[in-house]
């Protein structure tokens, strides 16, 4: 299951000029860029709304609905006629559309997600009939609040039994429900202990739990052996120090970056194992995962690697992420399609895959981020003064003296690239490619 196209009209800051993204089928990662207020989260919410009818066909799974506040209000303060989300999905070569609306000043047309709905119903009926080899796709949405979670203090209220489709519970809610994962992991550890006793094999490990452990082990390399202890109730892992010794830590004791990644990866792997427990490797489950601000609380070194890590651990998932970080773009250069929402409706193509993005400075100075220079803003006035003097038709003695002073002060900046140089380089590369010339 993957998203192939999404278009949005009259949603929040997106007005009557439809915003449409056609997704490259050769890429498993879509990176959304844009200034604050240009609709990165809006696009993610729209995708969540479009795909929600699929999990909503299963028992106990709520639909994901937008509110009246999501309908666009124009500059005159008038609400639009209605909000429209139009998406196209594909699953094993079968194309499915999902068109959803939200009422504004007029009644909406009838929504159309029958293909998506029927595909889900067919899966549900096959599971109930206990047919074999039925794979449930995964849908998940991790918002910016995913770092604010609480570990339950007691086992009270834990779910005792899990159906395969329970993998969809709270999945499209952008707030991470760590308690749900906690309850599932606790139950599976109990089952693993009972299976060890039944099999008379103290080395036995649950394949389902191993999927979660393996996912965490690959992405969070310095931490191993995730487990739940009951007195007091806590989720802990062992940190491997540089000297090889182990140090037990509760998840609450970890940095925000580690907490966010561990909670997200554990939740995602658990949902995959829950959805497809009979798969040889549940981490090969297909599906769509949305992550808002994927760089949240991550050190630049980890930002550079996180997309590669996620696609290696979950090879059949489609990740659609937003970011403000050029390091994320550099790290995902080979595997991701990059869409700049600032220019998506411009004549120029906003899909920047043909741009050579070999370093962070180049990305910052490209049209993806729009910085003019990499130096501190404190130099702007001096550069402006120099440019003003140079623009004069004739220079006085005082002008030449001041230019010499400015050149001395600015000489350390002359080696830094600027946006014009980057654009010139990109244009040369583009022309060379068109003319089949090797540079």
Residue ranges and their predicted role:
Residues 170-284:
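Extended helical coiled-coil dimerization/tether regions that scaffold
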Residues 140-143, 225-230, 236, 321, ...:
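A structural signal for short, well-ordered beta-strand segments and their strand-loop junctions
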Residues 1-180, 385, 415-439:
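P-loop NTPase switch/coupling surface
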């Amino acid at each position: 299951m993957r998203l192939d196209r999404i278009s949005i009209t009259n949603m929040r800051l997106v007005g009557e000029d439809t915003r449409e993204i056609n997704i490259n089928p050769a890429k498993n990662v879509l990176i959304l860029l844009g200034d604050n207020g240009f609709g990165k989260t809006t696009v993610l919410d729209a995708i969540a709304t479009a795909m929600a009818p699929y999990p909503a066909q299963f028992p106990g799974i709520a639909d994901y609905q937008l509110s009246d506040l999501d309908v666009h209000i124009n500059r005159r303060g008038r609400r639009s006629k209605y909000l429209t989300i139009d998406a196209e999905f594909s699953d094993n070569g079968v194309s499915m559309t999902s068109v959803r609306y939200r009422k504004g000043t007029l009644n909406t047309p009838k929504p159309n997600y029958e293909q998506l709905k029927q595909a889900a119903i067919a899966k549900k009926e096959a599971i109930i009939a206990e047919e074999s080899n039925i794979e449930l796709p995964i849908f998940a949405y991790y918002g910016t609040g995913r770092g604010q979670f609480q570990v339950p203090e007691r086992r009270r209220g834990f779910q005792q039994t899990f159906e395969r489709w329970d993998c969809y519970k709270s999945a499209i809610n952008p707030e991470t429900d760590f308690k749900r994962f906690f309850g599932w992991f606790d139950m599976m550890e109990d089952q693993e202990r009972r299976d060890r006793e039944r099999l008379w094999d103290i080395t036995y490990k649950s394949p389902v739990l191993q999927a979660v452990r393996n996912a965490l082990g690959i992405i969070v390399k310095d931490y191993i052996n995730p487990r739940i202890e009951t007195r007091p109730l806590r989720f802990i892992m062992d940190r491997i120090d540089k000297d090889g010794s182990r140090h037990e830590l509760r998840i609450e004791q970890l940095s925000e970056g580690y907490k966010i990644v561990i909670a997200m990866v554990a939740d995602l792997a658990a949902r995959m194992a829950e959805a497809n427990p009979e798969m040889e490797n549940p981490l090969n489950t297909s599906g769509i995962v949305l992550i808002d601000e994927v760089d949240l609380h991550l050190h630049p070194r980890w930002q550079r690697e996180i997309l590669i890590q996620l696609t290696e651990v979950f090879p059949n998932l489609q990740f659609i992420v937003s970011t403000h970080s050029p390091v994320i773009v550099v790290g995902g250069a080979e595997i991701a399609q990059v869409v700049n929402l600032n220019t998506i409706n411009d004549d120029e193509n906003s899909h920047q895959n043909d741009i050579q993005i070999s370093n962070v400075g180049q990305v910052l100075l490209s049209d993806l981020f729009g910085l003019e220079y990499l130096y501190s803003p404190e130099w702007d006035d001096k550069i402006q003064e120099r440019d003003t003097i140079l623009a004069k038709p004739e220079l006085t003695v005082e002008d030449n003296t001041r230019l010499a002073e400015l050149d001395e002060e600015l000489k350390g900046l002359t080696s830094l690239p600027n946006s014009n140089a980057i654009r010139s380089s990109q244009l040369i590369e583009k022309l060379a490619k068109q003319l089949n010339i090797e540079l």
